[in-house]
């Protein structure tokens, strides 16, 4: 089974104002000492896990050139421009349509472009475990933190945990 990645990079970065602006949102900014942007760090983090030709970037049409400049290794046809920004579900749907048109049987990992991940080794282990679970059947696997309260800006999934969770920070 093929593993693909969809990186969501269409946000305007409004919650990160004033550092982030509509013409240069958070995912295209360098917020760490190494000078790499958030989206570059995301691609770098998954590059040992997913072939670069199977990495898709879903973004706003206004950010297409920024994606091309910052991620020259991503095939141009893998830069998916959302016709209208409508948040996560339509973005994931757009990516799923493109992956399904290329592969009959694939796992699609969906990642935000602007998360700060401090432990890449734990991230990679978690990524591999999630892919393995997804490959075992028609499974939706989510990875995240345990929320303290519902937040409409991020969504909320209520789950029943049948297996113990791994309490390692990523």
List the predicted regions and their residue ranges:
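Conserved N-terminal catalytic core of the sugar/cofactor nucleotidyltransferase
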Residues: 1-7, 15-18, 33-112, 118
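Short glycine-rich, Thr/Ser-proximal phosphate-binding strand/loop in the N-terminal lobe
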Residues: 23-29
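Conserved beta-strand scaffold positions in the cores of enzyme catalytic domains, especially
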Residues: 28, 79, 140-142
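Short acidic, glycine/serine/threonine-rich loops at helix termini
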Residues: 17-21, 69, 120-123, 152-158
